């Protein structure tokens, strides 16, 4: 269930665990944390050793959780493969970098999630990069709390989105991107949206094992603000 018209507001709460969005093919998109609470992608990249529970992401950036439901933690290009060549190795280096990425799915607030390539304000295609980086000495073992948002580090805001034109709207519109890298070319935490830009449909919260509220306060922003952002 996706709102037909996303309602703009200050950033909204999102589930700590479970589905935060769905792909256009109906597969759940989860936040960056795995069951034990670490960054599943950082573990896959070898940044830390997971000693709490066996975790492994397949070639497409996903795996099965409790109950056997397959879900994605990052965009490994399987859902939108469009290479510059005839290659089918699903390597990011071979993704067509001269065209805007397609829509991968929709967050529960109704906004679209595009792949990693988008338009800047001059309609030039570029890789959209996140604005998060690891806190000094952190590895991702602590999940979301190991990261800090640095405004201007990359192209995207705290929720991993921005306002520009897209192939579906010449008028600039808010949308999310999947991210492979951050602004200094390290791994692209949070990989998919980290919070909601608009009011999500509450009927979606709790699907596929989500726990609803109780998420962390927004990274890099004071919790004393009157309008708080909250991560998955």
Task: Identify the residue ranges that each predicted region occupies.
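Short linear interaction motifs
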Residues: 48-59, 150-158
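Extracellular/lumenal glycan-associated surfaces
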Residues: 23-28, 66-79, 169-187
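Extended, compositionally biased non-globular segments
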Residues: 99, 106-211, 217
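Solvent-exposed N-terminal domain segments of exported/luminal and surface proteins
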Residues: 1-51
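Extracellular structured ligand-interaction cores
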Residues: 17-19, 57, 67-71, 75, ...
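Disordered, low-complexity segments in secreted/periplasmic proteins that are enriched in proline
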Residues: 208-232
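A short, polar beta-strand/turn micro-motif
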Residues: 1-17, 74-118, 188, 193-199
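Aromatic- and glycine-enriched beta-alpha-beta binding-site module
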Residues: 50-87
């Amino acid at each position: 269930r996706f709102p037909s018209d996303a309602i703009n507001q200050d950033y909204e709460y999102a589930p700590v665990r479970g589905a935060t969005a769905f792909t256009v093919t109906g597969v759940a998109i989860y936040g960056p944390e795995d069951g034990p609470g670490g960054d599943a992608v950082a573990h896959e990249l070898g940044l830390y050793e997971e000693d709490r529970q066996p975790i492994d992401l397949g070639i497409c950036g996903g795996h099965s959780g409790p109950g056997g439901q397959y879900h994605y933690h990052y965009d490994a290009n399987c859902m939108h493969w469009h290479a510059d060549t005839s290659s089918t190795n699903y390597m990011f280096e071979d993704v067509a970098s001269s065209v805007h990425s397609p829509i991968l799915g929709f967050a529960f607030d109704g906004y679209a999630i595009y792949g990693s390539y988008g338009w800047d304000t001059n309609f030039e295609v570029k890789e959209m990069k996140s604005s998060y980086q690891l806190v000094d000495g952190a590895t991702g073992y602590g999940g979301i709390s190991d990261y800090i948002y640095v405004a201007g580090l990359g192209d995207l805001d705290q929720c991993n989105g921005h306002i520009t034109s897209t192939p579906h709207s010449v008028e600039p519109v808010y949308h999310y991107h999947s991210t492979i890298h951050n602004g200094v070319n390290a791994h692209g935490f949070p990989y998919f949206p980290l919070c909601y830009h608009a009011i999500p449909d509450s009927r979606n919260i709790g699907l596929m094992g989500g726990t609803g509220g109780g998420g962390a306060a927004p990274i890099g922003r004071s919790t004393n603000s009157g309008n708080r952002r909250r991560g998955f």
